[in-house]
C-alpha cells in the first residue's frame, strides 16, 4: 500500500507488480498510509495536502473523509476502545483528532495543541489503570492525553529541541514502569514514567511495530475486560490466578490466547516463576 506526492494517489501494489488506484486526492500525500483490519474488512487511511484525512476500503470505496482545515503530515495510529476502533492523527493547524471508523469524533476530541503536528501518536497504558493514553511530540513539547481528552499528570513535558519522531514506548530497564523514547532535532530523549504500565496490544511505536507495517488488526478476546494477572478474567488479581499459573507451569497445561497473555506478566513470551513472583508482588502491594 503506497501514497504518492506526484499523482496524489492511494494505491495498492500486488505481489505480481500490478497496481490498483484506490483514491485520487486533490493534492499530494506526504505521509505513509495506515491500515486497520476488523474481521474481513480493511480500511486504509492517509492524510493529504488537500486538508483531508482520507479513509478508503481495499476496493476503493470511500469510507469517510475528515476535513481538518490544513495539511495532514502525520500518519494515522489506531486504538481499540471497548470494541470500537479509533484513529488518531494531527494536522498543520495544531488540531489532534480522534475519530471512529465512520469519521465521528471520540468524546473530548479533537484537542487544539496550537502548533503544527507532523509526528504520529503512540499508545500505552501509562498508569496501569486499564485505559490507554495517547502520546505525541509537537515542537518542543511531549503531550500525553487520557482517552477523554484530559492531560495526563505532569504533562506536557518540555524539551529544548523539537521532537521529530513518534514515541517508542517500552519498559527498557525491566522495572515495571514504562519509558518514552523520542527522537529530537538535537538528541534522543528518554522519559521515565515511574508508574506501573503496559504496552500490550497497543500501537506503542512509530508505524505500529518493528517492521513499520502501519498495520493494526482488531483481535476478539474471550475476556471482556483483559488485564495482566487476571488469568481467570473475574476482574480481580488474587490467589486463584496464581493457582492457574502454577498449574500451567507444573503441568505444562494448554492455555487460551487470553490466559497465556494474562499469565505472562513480564511479557517475555514465557510463563514461569518470574511471572508468579510478579503477580504475588501485585497482590501484596
What are these regions (language model features)?
Residues 220-285:
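Cellulosome-associated attachment modules in secreted, modular CAZymes
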Residues 1-222:
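Extracytoplasmic/lumenal domain signature
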Amino acid at each position: 500500500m503506497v501514497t504518492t506526492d506526484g499523482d496524489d494517489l492511494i494505491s495498492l501494489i500486488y505481489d505480481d507488480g500490478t497496481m490498483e488506484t484506490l483514491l485520487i486526492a486533490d493534492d499530494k500525500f506526504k505521509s505513509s498510509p495506515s491500515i486497520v483490519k476488523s474481521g474481513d474488512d480493511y480500511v486504509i487511511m492517509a492524510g493529504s495536502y488537500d486538508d483531508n484525512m482520507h479513509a478508503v476500503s481495499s476496493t476503493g470505496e470511500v469510507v469517510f473523509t475528515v476535513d481538518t482545515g490544513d495539511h495532514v503530515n502525520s500518519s494515522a495510529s489506531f486504538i481499540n476502545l471497548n470494541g470500537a476502533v479509533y484513529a488518531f492523527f494531527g494536522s498543520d493547524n495544531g488540531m489532534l483528532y480522534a475519530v471512529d471508523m465512520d469519521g465521528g469524533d471520540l468524546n473530548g476530541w479533537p484537542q487544539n495543541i496550537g502548533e503544527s503536528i507532523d509526528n504520529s501518536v503512540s499508545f500505552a497504558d501509562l498508569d496501569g489503570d486499564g485505559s490507554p493514553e495517547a502520546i505525541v511530540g509537537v515542537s518542543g513539547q511531549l503531550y500525553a492525553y487520557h482517552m477523554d481528552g484530559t492531560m495526563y499528570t505532569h504533562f506536557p513535558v518540555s524539551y529544548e529541541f523539537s521532537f521529530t519522531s513518534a514515541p517508542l514506548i517500552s519498559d527498557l530497564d525491566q522495572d515495571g514502569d514504562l519509558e518514552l523514547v523520542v527522537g529530537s532535532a538535537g538528541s534522543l530523549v528518554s522519559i521515565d514514567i515511574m508508574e506501573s504500565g503496559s504496552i500490550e496490544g497497543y500501537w506503542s511505536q512509530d508505524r505500529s511495530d518493528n517492521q513499520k507495517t502501519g498495520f493494526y488488526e482488531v483481535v476478539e478476546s474471550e475476556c471482556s475486560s483483559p488485564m495482566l494477572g487476571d488469568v481467570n478474567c473475574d476482574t480481580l488479581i488474587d490467589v486463584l490466578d496464581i493457582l492457574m499459573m502454577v498449574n500451567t507451569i507444573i503441568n505444562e497445561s494448554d492455555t487460551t490466547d487470553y490466559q497465556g497473555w494474562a499469565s505472562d506478566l513480564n511479557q517475555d513470551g514465557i510463563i514461569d516463576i518470574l511471572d508468579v513472583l510478579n503477580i504475588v508482588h501485585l497482590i501484596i502491594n
